[in-house]
Amino acid sequence: MKLIQRINLFVLVACCILASCTKNFTDTNTDPNRPKSITPGVLLSQMQYRFVNASIGSARNFGHELMQVTAPRASTSGGVHRYVVTASSNSGIWTSMYTLLADVQELYNTSGKLNEKNYQAIALIYKAWSYSILTDCYGDVPFSQAMQAAQGNLQPAFDPQKDIYIQLFKDLDSANKWLSTPRALRYGGDLVYKGNPDTQDSLVNMAKWRRFANSLKLRMLLRVSKRNGEVNVNEQITTILTNAATYPLFTGNADDAIFRYPGTNPFYNPYYNARQSDWQFDNCYTQFFINKMNGDNDPRRAVWSTTVDNGIYRGIQSGYTSEVVNIVGANSSYSDGLKTLPQLGIMMSYAELEFIKAELALKGFVTGSTPQAHYERGITASMAQWGAPMPSGYLSQTGVAYDAVATTERQLEQIMLQKYYAFFFTDMQAWFEKRRTGYPVLPRGAGIPAANQFPSRCPYPTYLQSLNPVNLGNAVKAIGGTDVSTVQGWWEK
């Protein structure tokens, strides 16, 4: 009987993930502790917390290993660091995002009934943020039919990545419009920007949501910039950059889209009680990641990393051969401080926006400053974000100083390398940008088989083969008939 119950529970959860089945639960499936009347504020706070837990989990468990931030201390075969990416390598992000997108839809619907456009705008921002991560990770994913459980659709079709992006741009435009007249969130619940009625400067804080919407759109437009002929990317970028009053962007670190863990129940940093064996001993920073920081005397090391041998920051190889043995405690890993650090819940930072502007300025867009000025602001902002005082002369030293007379490609490489470090714990953005630009250039470990290529996507979770076989099959056919990690997405080609 217990086995049958577990199987039934698995099927129920999986169906909820696939089709966001959140309505019409029977009484036996209703949480007795859940309020009968759900307000937008109750939905928002829990959703905000769980979203960043999922995103930073994907950073630590997948993105960091793939992008040579960390590598497993012990690995005799396979592994993401050797470019072996399977359906289970990152399936948690699919499960988490689709579960939480049901909450986004509920927030949108509930707010609509109450005519609370500001809550609806926030729901659209979370929708764009989460779906952009999903489609950048997998390619075509359920989108237009993903929220139709109430209509009986438990097997949603997969939408083309292009169509998803086009709709998300429209959603962000709607959010920007609805937030143009900021007012406090009547039902509270905002733990990101504190746009709550009982918060000082709530109207100022609500304006930050609008800046996030437009900054996120700029990120996404740059992501698909190779497809300018199919989507009017350059026109939309120019419109945002030249109309600050209509499309306000982040202006400083105070605008960072970060869920700052308060350190109180129930919103603890998800790693606050992680065992040392799981947090530090199983993974170490790589030589690629640490050696650059050592060479630059990067002050963020003290925030991010442990030391060994009386203050040394040391990394291990990534993609190493099977006979390599890394001794426990001999190399640097995540610092204990990160486990309780409030600012770990990153969605998008001001530092990232400055690096986006640096690249756009390099490509000829009018941003108001030079590529170098944006580059230096990006580095400075990242230091401030992590509470790492920047040493005097840091920006002018060899290895950091911007080379404005170098080739355009070399300048882009400089920008992207610093952006890579600024992406620390920002879901899988470093991977997405590596696929778009080719930077940073990662060394290929001696233990990576010659046949293994740097992945462009994650294969779909295996449980979809039984829960949504027809539409999964159609999605696989659309990418060439083989569900593997080397198939490039629409914006990457």
Language-model features: locations:
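Generic recognition of cysteine residues
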Residues: 15-16, 137, 284, 458
